[in-house]
Regions:
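Extended, helix-rich architectural segments
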Residues: 1-124, 439-453
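Generic structural signal for hydrophobic core residues of well-folded globular domains
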Residues: 30, 44-52, 56, 60, ...
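Generic detection of long, well-ordered alpha-helical segments
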Residues: 69-76, 84, 213-224, 228, ...
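Short coil/turn segments at secondary-structure boundaries
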Residues: 82, 97-98, 238-246, 312-317, ...
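Short loop/turn hinge sites at secondary-structure boundaries
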Residues: 89-91, 135, 401
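Extended, regular secondary-structure scaffolds
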Residues: 93-209
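Extended, charged amphipathic alpha-helical segments
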Residues: 179-328, 364-365, 375-378
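C-terminal anchoring/interaction modules
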Residues: 254-273, 279-284, 289-306, 322-453
């Protein structure tokens, strides 16, 4: 892709060679590409990404303004795929595509686009994409360049006919039905950036210190290779540890394929001493415990570098740990999940803001967006929060007379409880006996402390 973009637009990928090699390594770890001397059967990268993704969206709910609700619904439909792409490659782009009354979204993996420019914060100022098309037995290459500018987004599109593996001659966009409606150059005023929302992992670049985002397991990539080598050694140990029969040369004979085997009746009439027949059985001792102990050390180190709590990749430690150690491990995991949830919320806000800007360009009425007001995301209780324990504490306070039951119920059912009318409504709907006992005009005490205020 890099050479094609350079030939077509005179601008190549700004990603460093070290970073490109690291991206290939992350993808190989995730997709289980075998390396010499390694066994990728464990697929630790897949396990890490799937665990994080499931936890991030375990209790996820989202709401937005009615005009953008179809677009948010389409965005939520691809949230898992987009999050996984971002965790694997460090960055994932979300491309809005006009569909009906809103927009659909297409997640773009890190190795499927080329950054042509970045600002000081790592945001894309130019990006190139490539698509291979087939028509009438011929291959075509559709190249697109997006450039951010003060006047808006500029999109340049060029179509080339492939000449084998090389970029051939340029042909008009009207050559193919799929590209006939495209324009060679298009300016979208009012559209910020490159017209693509970005999901970027919150990790600092540990590869070359550049502006590119890194995979969530990038710090643990070396340990994952060590685990793969250890798995390969363990497999070899088991294969080489099979029992072997050593027999004298005169007891072997060749079959019709040239393979040397023992005689069929060799084991029929063995005397008491096998040495008299020239046969020795050897069963080597396997080093299973040493291999497993080393593997657990590697997995625990991976958990520390990724930000997992103990027991997600490794086995739960048999030895008891102090409360401080347990709290530290779970606290790190909670922070990891919160950072990824903030990453998605920021990316979703970018996507909906982009939909509103594109809606104005396309003449779609009523599309406006304010991330602080129009987008609400509920992530549930979180990793560390124990709802049952908190409810029991509130009930204990109610029993002791330290907390009004209306406030406890308001917290449990997430009901408004700011004034007397709202508390009276809670009594009427959830505490019928108390509502009957209390006078209808009973004035609530002022200065009540709200839960969660």
């Amino acid at each position: 892709m890099k050479s094609y973009l350079e030939q077509a637009f005179g601008r190549g990928d700004v990603t460093s060679a070290r970073m490109q090699a690291a991206i290939r390594e992350w993808l190989n770890l995730y997709y289980g590409t075998q390396s010499p001397g390694e066994d990728a059967a464990d697929r630790l990268a897949v396990l890490a990404v799937s665990k994080l993704c499931r936890t991030v969206f375990a209790e996820y709910e989202s709401r937005t303004a009615e005009a953008l609700a179809p677009s948010l619904q389409a965005l939520d439909a691809v949230r898992v795929q987009a999050m996984q792409y971002a965790l694997v490659g460090g960055e994932c782009l979300l491309k809005p595509v006009l569909h009906g009354r809103g927009f659909d979204f297409v997640p773009i993996r890190r190795d499927c686009y080329a950054p042509l420019g970045r600002d000081a914060h790592g945001a894309l100022t130019g990006v190139g994409t490539m698509e291979v098309l087939r028509h009438d037995g011929r291959g075509y290459l559709l190249l697109e360049r997006r450039t951010a500018g003060a006047d808006g987004l500029t999109i340049e599109t060029r179509l080339f006919e492939l000449a084998g593996e090389a970029l051939g001659r340029e042909v008009p966009l009207a050559t193919l039905p799929a590209t006939a409606q495209l324009q060679p150059s298009l300016l979208l005023p009012g559209v910020r950036g490159v017209g693509l929302a970005a999901l970027r992992t919150p990790l600092l670049n540990c590869v070359d210190g550049g502006p590119d985002a890194v995979a969530v397991y990038a710090p643990a990539a070396g340990l994952m290779h060590s685990a793969a080598r250890l798995e390969y050694q363990m497999r070899q140990e088991f294969e080489n540890g099979a029992s072997r029969v050593f027999a004298s040369e005169d007891l072997l004979r060749e079959d019709g394929y040239g393979r040397r085997t023992l005689q069929d009746d060799l084991f029929i009439g063995l005397p008491d001493d096998p040495a008299n027949v020239g046969v020795t059985v050897y069963s080597p001792q396997l080093r299973v415990e040493q291999f497993l102990a080393r593997k657990q050390d590697i997995l625990r180190s991976c958990e520390s570098l990724i930000g997992f709590k103990r027991g997600i990749l490794s086995e739960v430690e048999a030895a008891e740990r102090t409360a401080t150690e347990i709290t530290s491990s779970e606290g790190d995991y909670n922070l990891t999940i919160q950072e990824l949830q903030a990453m998605w919320q920021n990316g979703a806000g970018q996507a909906l803001e982009l939909c509103a800007a594109l809606g104005k360009v396309y003449g779609m009425p009523g599309l406006s967006f304010d991330a602080g007001k129009d987008l609400t995301m509920d992530w549930g209780d979180g990793v560390l929060f124990d709802r049952t324990r908190t409810w029991n504490e509130y009930m204990s306070m109610v029993t002791s007379g330290l907390l009004r039951p209306e406030l406890a119920l308001a917290w449990y059912f997430d009901l408004p409880h700011a004034d007397a009318a709202q508390l009276a409504k809670i009594r009427k709907e959830l505490m019928p006996q108390a509502a009957q006992a209390a006078p209808a005009n009973n004035e609530e005490k002022k200065g009540e402390t709200q839960i969660g205020a």
